[in-house]
From Swiss-Prot:
Protein name from the UniProt record: DNA repair protein RecO
Pfam families (alphabetical): RecO_C, RecO_N
Family per similarity comment: Belongs to the RecO family.
NCBIfam families per UniProt: reco (TIGR00613)
Keywords: DNA damage, DNA recombination, DNA repair
Length: 288
């Protein structure tokens, strides 16, 4: 008799398997990332029905198998159906789901990661369906917020408050329109521009690997202030007043940082790019 176990899980990925089955990648708080078969879920009258769709949270009864475990029963707790009703929301949700699949552990409890992902998916889902500048700014801001928190839980979030070279705290200077600070992906965060010589000295003391350390981009005061919001549990209401382009730059910076430190190219990020291009005429003609 097959051994049974219970788990709560959110569907992150689904692949067709055989004639009517589906192979699901699921994040559970109890067992981390698991891959299980949802038998017959692609049949029109399947007893599992929509429980095998993406971003559905189920209470599961699973039977152990030789190679793959199988879902015996599934009861839906909640689902983020609103994500599929808007291309931007769907792209953002898939982006976070793909990132989670790279950082989640298998056969280990992932309670904090499970709740964190659900929290950010819910925020994105609850955004009102619009295509104006304000809505798009909030979408990218919420996505960047989720990315940062996932990196933080993995212990690899970029340093956004202290200079990576000196450890000194950096504050954006809004009174100087030319004020900038550097961001180094391999050094791990922000660097005061006039501290580049310190960076080189700092790197030589560590290893030859760090000799290639460089400032990848310069960011202005507003962009730094946005980065410095990301560690907070909630974004400030300033998100309604900030530049759409600044949030796009923050997301792209986090994307490059994430891909570098995980050694993985985030495929779902292309969906975000496609979406932003599709609405760019509306964004360019809109005002907040």
């Amino acid at each position: 008799m097959a051994k049974l176990y219970k788990a709560t899980g959110i569907n992150l990925k689904a692949m067709a398997l055989g004639e009517s089955d589906r192979l699901l990648t699921i994040l559970t708080p109890e067992y981390g990332l698991i891959r299980v078969v949802a038998p017959g879920v692609r049949k029109q009258k399947s007893k599992l029905g929509g429980r095998g769709e993406l971003f559905v949270v189920n209470q599961l009864l699973i039977s152990k198998g030789r190679s793959l475990d199988r879902i015996n029963q599934a009861e839906t707790i909640t689902s983020y159906t609103g994500l599929s009703q808007n291309l931007g929301k769907l792209a953002a949700g898939q982006y976070l789901a793909e990132l989670v699949q790279q950082i989640a552990l298998k056969e280990n409890p992932q309670t904090e990661l499970f709740h964190l992902l659900n929290e950010h998916l819910e925020r994105i889902e609850q955004l009102q369906h619009k295509t104006d500048r304000l809505w798009s700014t909030q979408l990218i801001a919420f996505l960047a917020h989720g990315i940062y928190h996932l990196l933080a839980i993995e212990g690899i979030a970029p340093q956004v408050h202290q200079c990576c070279a000196t450890g000194n705290e950096l504050q954006p200077d809004f009174n100087n329109s030319k004020w900038q600070v550097g961001f180094s992906i391999d050094a791990g965060g922000i660097i005061k521009v006039d501290e580049t010589s310190v960076v080189q000295s700092f790197c030589k003391d560590l290893s030859d690997y760090y000799l290639s350390t460089k400032i990848n981009t310069l960011i202005n005061a507003n962009q730094l202030s946005l980065l410095q919001q990301l560690p907070q549990p909630q974004l400030q209401t300033i998100v309604k007043l900030t530049s759409y382009q600044d949030w796009v730059k923050v997301e792209q910076l986090l994307r490059k940082y994430t891909q570098y430190h995980l050694g993985y190219s985030i495929r779902s990020a292309e969906l975000i790019d496609t979406y932003l291009k599709s609405i760019s005429p509306l964004i360019n003609n809109a005002t907040i």
